[in-house]
Amino acid sequence: MSRFARLRSPLWWLAGVALLLGQVAHAAPLSIGQLMAALAKNPQGAATFTEKKFIAILEQPIESSGELLFIAPARLEKRTLKPKPETMVLDGDILTLERGRRKHVLQLKDYPEVAAMIESIRATLAGDRKALERVYHLALDGGNERWTLVLTPLDPRVGAVIARIRMEGLKDVVHSVEILQADGDRSLMTIEKRAPQQ
């Protein structure tokens, strides 16, 4: 099994969390610059998710649900609650995976292609358009009422894993993130932003 195959699940959620926690408060038409500026104003956020993974060798999609959390500048968490508890935490350049009693800690420096993609996700969260465009081609369609952002990898090494990331939003809410892998498998995550706790 390749290094990319072992990290397939973490890659799916990292891309999804990149935009799910941002809000867009600008009038239509919406530009990439406006979207990035809005994301840069959000130091943290939380959401619930439902995810379906469509894998070629399986007749039915794999479904899961749980919670997502982002804390600027570099911490991302995905806590799957159903069907089985699982936790994935990215903190700095360390990715920690916990499934039952098993815990795996990975150094991103050992996975340069994966690190490049994750840094692009962080750049999105930070609203750093220049850093994002060093790795992806960005295409934004629509306006503030309904918009779609598509990220296409520029680096062939990243493109060997992820074909594209498609994010759709309605007004100031990102409601879906679809990730198409180079091998044809894909995931679709629907997100509901959680209100801040009092």
Predicted features and spans:
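Bacterial N-terminal signal peptides that target proteins for export
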Residues: 2-14
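Bacterial N-terminal signal peptides
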Residues: 12-22
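Flexible, processing/modification-adjacent segments and terminal tails
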Residues: 28-55, 59-61, 99-154, 161
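Short hydrophobic/aromatic-rich beta-strand segments that constitute the beta-sheet cores
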Residues: 49, 76-79, 95-97, 149-151, ...
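Amphipathic hydrophobic-ligand
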Residues: 60-66, 185
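Short, surface-exposed coil-to-beta transition loops
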Residues: 63-65, 84, 91, 159-164
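An acidic-aromatic
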Residues: 67-119, 187, 193
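Gly/Pro-enriched, hydrophobic low-complexity segments
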Residues: 129-136, 142-198
